Amino acid sequence: DCLLSRGLGDVYKRQVWGNSFSYYNPSQEWLGKLYLDVMPNIYANMQDVKSATEDVIPISIAQIIKVAALSRVTDTYGPIPYSQVGLDGKLVAPFDTEKEVYYKMFDELTDAINTLTINRTQNLTANADKVYSGNVEKWIKFANSLKLRMAMRICYVDKGKSEIMVKEAIDTSNGKLGVMTENSDNAFMPATINPFYMVCYSYNGGETKISADLSSYMNGYQDPRREIYGVTSTFDESENITNGFHGLRVGNEYPIKTG
C-alpha cells in the first residue's frame, strides 16, 4: 500500500504523476525488460570474469549467479538463447527449448558445485564477494538450493529428472553440504541503511501516513493490526470528528490532519 505524504508522495503529486498516466493504454516496455536488461548484463559479466581470471572459484560462483538469474528468464518466456550464446564469437544464438535450458543449467550447477566442493577451503577475499564474504561453502549450499528449486518446478512435467536433481541437491552423504538450512545461509547483499527507514524518515521526516484505502478496510473489519501499523488520530472536540485510525487519500501533498 502507498503510505504517502510530503516527500514520500513525490511521485504521486500532480507535478510528477498527476493525470499523465494512461490507465487504459499503459506502456508494455516491461514485457521485454528481462531480455533487455538481465540477459545482456549476465552474459557480459560472465565473460568479464572468465577474461579477468583463471581461478575456478570466482568462475564457478559467476556460473551459479548466471543460472540463478536466467532461470527466471526462461521461467518467464520459455525458450531463450542459452547454450550457444557467445560460442565461436557469434553475435546471434539460436533459441533453446525450456527443457534444453533447464537441463543445461542443471549440468552447469553440478559442475560448479563439484568444483567448489573440491576447493571448499579456499575462500575468496571478503571484498570480492558481497553476498557471502568469500565463504565458498555458503555458495555450495546456495547452488544446491537453487537446483532443488528448479527441480521442484519441473516435477509435474519431467518427474524422473526432477527426482534425480532433488536427490542430488539434498544429499549430505560423504561430507556433502546439501541445501540452505538456516538464516545464516541466506543469500543477500547487506545494506548499511535500512531502506524502509530511509524512505519513511530520511526522505519524509517521519511524516508517513496510512492510506485511506488501507484504513477503510482495516476499520471495516476491526483489524487488530491497526495498533501495530499506526497510532490513532487526535482532533479537537470542536471538529466533531471521532478519533481513530483515519487514513489519508493517496496523492495529498500536505496532510491537514495527522495520525
Language model region names:
Residues K13-I65, A69-G259:
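Structured, solvent-exposed acidic/aromatic patches
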